[in-house]
Every structure is written in C-alpha cells, then in structure tokens.
Amino acid sequence: MKIGLSKSIINHAGFVYDAVDQGWYNTLKGHNLFFIPNTLNQDFNVMANDLDSLILTGGEYAEQRSEVEQALVNKMTEHNKPVVGIAESAFYIAGLLGGELEYIEKHFDINHPIFYHREVLEVNSHHDKCIKSLPNSANVLCLDYLGNVEAFTHGNLAGIVWNPEKMEKPWIPPEIAYMLRI
C-alpha cells in the first residue's frame, strides 16, 4: 500500500523544516510511505490518485500545513480514498464532521485508559482538547474514562486522538487499520 503521511513544520535556528515522527516507520512497516511536502505548489489531484490512503500525522498547528492538508483531504474524498487524522488532525476531521470539541485539563503528556468494545487499553495523550460528541452518522470506536471520543470512523474518514506511532506497541483500532489496509 502507498500511504501518504503529512509532515509537521519545524522552525530551528532560523530555518524551516518539514518533519515526521520516526515512529511511523515501525508502525507502517511493510508499506510504501510517501511524505507530503508542505507546499501548495503541487498537483493534489495527481497525488490523491497515486495514494491508497492518507494519514494526517499529529503535531502543532501551522497555517501552511493546514492549507496543504485541506487541499489533499478534499481530493482524497473526491477519489473516495481513506483519510485518517491522528491527534490534532483527529480534531480537524471531527470538526469537518460537525463534532463538538472542548479543552480538557490534566490530559497533556499522560497515559490513560480507553475503552474499545469491552477491552480496556492504555494510550498516550499529548493534547489539551477532546471530542465531546460527533454526529449520529459517525461510528465511535473508543472512549476515554470521561466519555470523550478517542477514535471514530465516518465513511472514508477516521480519527485517532492518541499517537500510535509513539507507543511501544503501536495500536490502531482494527476498523481503521482495515481502512488503511495495514
């Protein structure tokens, strides 16, 4: 599978870099990875046609990155291909669907339990937001201990609020792994 991965924008020593967490190499082992440049000067239609799926990786908000991701998400949905948002990008996908987001306290740089069907799993949290609700048409897969949405699908769109690439044993809900064909 050819999986597109968006990249964070890092400012360091007066220079601007695109970057991706190296944990994705292990998480997506055996797949062809294509890293999306943070520039609008590219053909998103051709890119969407070439990719099998797209992962919007986590990371801090940057306007340029956001514009690139929006352009590619639009083309991926036109091509009926899966798009999965991770962490901050899960909030973006939830917002597209009309989900309700809120700030949450004591949820930054911690591990916490989530509920997947009848299983309790531990995941990480590197954010101070939560998804309070999604439209009824969304399929909620995981909830945290406060009842906030931690993973969901909606057609070819999905979100995972934690960072699977930062886990010792990366875990992606099977429904989303199936969408990505991983």
Task: Kindly give the residue locations of the regions a language model identified.
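Catalytic His-Asp charge-relay segment
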Residues: L157-I160
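N-terminal beta1-alpha1 cap of cysteine-dependent amidohydrolase-like domains
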Residues: M1-E88, G95-E102, H107-V120, D128, ...
